[in-house]
């Protein structure tokens, strides 16, 4: 389904003038010549177009003579967006480009008085003023515009679409939006298709988080923590055999069984909500139309009033000899049918450090090759402490090197690989042999092969990310986007879920609540877990100035770790306060066990405007790690010692 470009109004000429201000004989067009859709009534007063009274009458004639009138300026971006909106709805409209009209300046002044609008565009629908760019888009998003257009039903409005909403991507955000929209009685379809990795790995419904991200990562992190707990248990009186071994195959089987149950649960939930699910690859082929191709190559065409892009990201490859042939990514690791053995992890992202951490935690020989800094975008003080802790626990780091070639020495499960790497600041070349090489150098948005250029959706050409409004709307009014593919937004599963639900509520339930992307809590599940909310120290200095922030910090020693006497003065707490705003806490950071559990509650406090004084007045729970935040007294600026002798300070 779709609509022909330039539909006629009342069987007349195309609805949008493309005359560039001239008529057939080359004369500059007068406002009186602009009537392509319907024949305008004769000038009721017989005035010349230069008179204010006549201008008002002429403008009123346009408004009365057409179902949809857009007073526009040809060079105005907002005007173009409004015209695209009506085109996308297949609704005929009349446009008067005032900058291409002989008496346009006078008409614009009169229009300002008549419509009480100070800028263009100005839109009228069925003789009712909708307003400018913002009010028009808002009326569309709330459904008021569509209802008004269908009053007395013009014959040339499009037929109903196949669906109210088609969602491309069956990850956490897309599924949340689908179920929420269906709850309001909307007809919803989800298209989800997993392109296999270079090694052929595929998975089921649920997206990255469920299949190859948060869920298996946390479970394997738990496997590593249990190994540490077994060691600690001897100090608590448990008689554990000295030769405790980890069974990779059993762990993978358990993890994949759990993921399989989640995949099935999602399909059941969609069915119960009456959401149509197709395991097919979605590509836009025209306005409001999409092609769905299944794994057998069978194609179907669907139409929808609105679309939501929730395609997520996939791991990036190095583009060097041997990377796709011999290396794995996180997309492969969590279902790897054999123990990876001696492993090189390439990258310094949270994915790289988390995977390196749990692989080392189950007893493997792990090396991390780092191009520059650890955990780019995170607080670097915390990132460096994580790196130090990992090194102290046997994980090796090769810093300021990048692989330039990966070769297979011996095939097998695992086999043997040779990695050739070059220094980032010299000509030095090094080589190393590993059983497995895992790439975790970043992720790319899945936006370049879904036909966005066909419907005019803008993306950042460098990153593939999609810029959106604060309501997750792309530059094409009927297409929205959420999740990791958004430009300059937090890439976290709960954020995508929240954005998806709120979007559906705005579109179909009359809500005006938008997703708040500020002060989003997160946790990095490295061996020493890192929880954070708000600004990093670097960002706080950049935003408020070093002289206007105060950093309170302290090491702490979890009581549970005192009996095995390990990792004293490794756990660390830090808050960053804005001294110009009553020492409001603008950054919260913690390294230690259960960091995510600790951070979650404090995130709510930060959203409520938590101050240092309020923290100080809070009585802590003893003995727990989180109580350290109620007793922070040493500032970084002071340089005083923050070492702890025991769990009670």
Curated annotation (Swiss-Prot):
Q: Where is this region: Disordered?
A: 1-49
Give UniProt keywords alphabetically: Acetylation, Cytoplasm, Disulfide bond, Electron transport, FAD, Flavoprotein, NADP, Nucleus, Oxidoreductase, Phosphoprotein, Redox-active center, Selenocysteine, Transport, Ubl conjugation
- Positions of the Glutaredoxin domain: 56-156
State where composition is biased (Basic and acidic residues): 22-36
Concerning PROSITE patterns, the annotation shows:
GLUTAREDOXIN_2, PYRIDINE_REDOX_1
Linked residues for Cysteinyl-selenocysteine (Cys-Sec): 647-648
UniProt modified residues of type Phosphotyrosine? 281
Pfam families (UniProt xref) = Glutaredoxin, Pyr_redox_2, Pyr_redox_dim
The molecular function GO annotations come to:
FAD binding; identical protein binding; NADPH peroxidase activity; thioredoxin-disulfide reductase (NADPH) activity
Cystine links in this protein are 209-214
Task: Look up the record and report any one GO term of the cellular component aspect.
Answer: mitochondrion
Q: Where is the active site?
A: 622 (proton acceptor)
InterPro entries associated with the record: FAD/NAD-bd_sf, FAD/NAD-binding_dom, FAD/NAD-linked_Rdtase_dimer_sf, Glutaredoxin, GSHR/TRXR-like, Pyr_nucl-diS_OxRdtase_dimer, Pyr_OxRdtase_I_AS, Thioredoxin-like_sf
Quaternary structure, per UniProt, is: Homodimer. Interacts with HERC5.
- Which NCBIfam families did the record assign? TGR
**Remaining remarks:** The thioredoxin reductase active site is a redox-active disulfide bond. The selenocysteine residue is also essential for catalytic activity.
Q: Which family does the record assign?
A: Belongs to the class-I pyridine nucleotide-disulfide oxidoreductase family.
**What's its job?**
Reduces disulfideprotein thioredoxin (Trx) to its dithiol-containing form. Homodimeric flavoprotein involved in the regulation of cellular redox reactions, growth and differentiation. Contains a selenocysteine residue at the C-terminal active site that is essential for catalysis. Also has reductase activity on hydrogen peroxide (H2O2).
Protein's recorded name: Thioredoxin reductase 1, cytoplasmic
**Which species is this record about?**
Homo sapiens
């Amino acid at each position: 389904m779709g609509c022909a470009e330039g539909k006629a109004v009342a069987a007349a000429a195309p609805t949008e003038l493309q005359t560039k201000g001239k008529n057939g004989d080359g004369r500059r067009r007068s406002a009186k010549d602009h009537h392509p859709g319907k024949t305008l009534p004769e000038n009721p007063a017989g005035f010349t177009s230069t008179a204010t009274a006549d201008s008002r009458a002429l403008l009123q004639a346009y408004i009365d003579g057409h179902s949809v009138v857009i007073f526009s300026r040809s060079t105005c971006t907002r005007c173009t967006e409004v015209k695209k909106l009506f085109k996308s709805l297949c609704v005929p409209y009349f446009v008067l480009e005032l900058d291409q009209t002989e008496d346009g300046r006078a008409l614009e002044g009169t229009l300002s008085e008549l419509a009480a609008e100070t800028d263009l565009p100005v839109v009228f629908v069925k003789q009712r003023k909708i307003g400018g760019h913002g009010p028009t888009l808002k009326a569309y998003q709330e459904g008021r515009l569509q209802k008004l257009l269908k009053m007395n039903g013009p014959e040339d409005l499009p037929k109903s679409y196949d669906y109210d909403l088609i969602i491309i991507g069956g990850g956490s955000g897309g599924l949340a939006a689908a179920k929420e929209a269906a709850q309001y009685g909307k007809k919803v379809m989800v298209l989800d298709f997993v392109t296999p990795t270079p090694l052929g790995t595929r998975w089921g419904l649920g997206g990255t988080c469920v299949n190859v991200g948060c869920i298996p990562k946390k479970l394997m992190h738990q496997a590593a923590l249990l190994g540490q707990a077994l060691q600690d248990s001897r100090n608590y009186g448990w008689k554990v055999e000295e030769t405790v071994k980890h069974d990779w195959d059993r762990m993978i089987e358990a993890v994949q069984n759990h993921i399989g149950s989640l995949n099935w649960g999602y399909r059941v939930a969609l069915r119960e909500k009456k959401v149509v699910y197709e395991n097919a690859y979605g590509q836009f082929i025209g306005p409001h139309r999409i092609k769905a191709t299944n794994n057998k190559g069978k194609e179907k065409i669907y139409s929808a009033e609105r679309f939501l892009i929730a395609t997520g990201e996939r791991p990036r490859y190095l583009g060097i000899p041997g990377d796709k042939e011999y290396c794995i990514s996180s997309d492969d690791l969590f279902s790897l049918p054999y123990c990876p053995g001696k492993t090189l992890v390439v990258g310094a992202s949270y994915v790289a450090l988390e995977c390196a951490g749990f692989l080392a935690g189950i007893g493997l020989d792990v090396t991390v090759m780092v191009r520059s800094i650890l955990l780019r975008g995170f607080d670097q003080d915390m990132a460096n402490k994580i790196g130090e802790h990992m090194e102290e626990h046997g994980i090796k780091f090769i810093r300021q090197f990048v692989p330039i070639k990966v070769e297979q020495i011996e095939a097998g499960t695992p086999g043997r690989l040779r990695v050739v790497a070059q220094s980032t600041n010299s000509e030095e070349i090094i080589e190393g042999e590993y059983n497995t090489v895992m790439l975790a150098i970043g992720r790319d948005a899945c936006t370049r092969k879904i036909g966005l250029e066909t419907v005019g959706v803008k993306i950042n050409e460098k990153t593939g990310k999609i810029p959106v409004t604060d309501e997750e709307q792309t530059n094409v009014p009927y297409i929205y986007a959420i999740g990791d593919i958004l430009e300059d937004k937090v890439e976290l599963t709960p954020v995508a879920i929240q954005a998806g639900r709120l979007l559906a509520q705005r579109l179909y339930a009359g809500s005006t609540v938008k997703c708040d992307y500020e002060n989003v809590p997160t946790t990095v599940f490295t061996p020493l877990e890192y929880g954070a909310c708000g600004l990093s120290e670097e960002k706080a200095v950049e935003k408020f100035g070093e002289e206007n922030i105060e950093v309170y910090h302290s090491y702490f020693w979890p009581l549970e770790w005192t009996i095995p006497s390990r990792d004293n003065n490794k756990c660390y707490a830090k808050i960053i306060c804005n001294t110009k705003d009553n020492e409001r806490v603008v950054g919260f950071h913690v390294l230690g066990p259960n960091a995510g559990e600790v951070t979650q509650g404090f995130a709510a406090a930060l959203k409520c405007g938590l101050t240092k004084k309020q923290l100080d007045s809070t009585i802590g729970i003893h003995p727990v790690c989180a109580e350290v935040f109620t007793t922070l007294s040493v500032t970084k600026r002071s340089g005083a010692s923050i070492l702890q002798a025991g769990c009670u300070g």
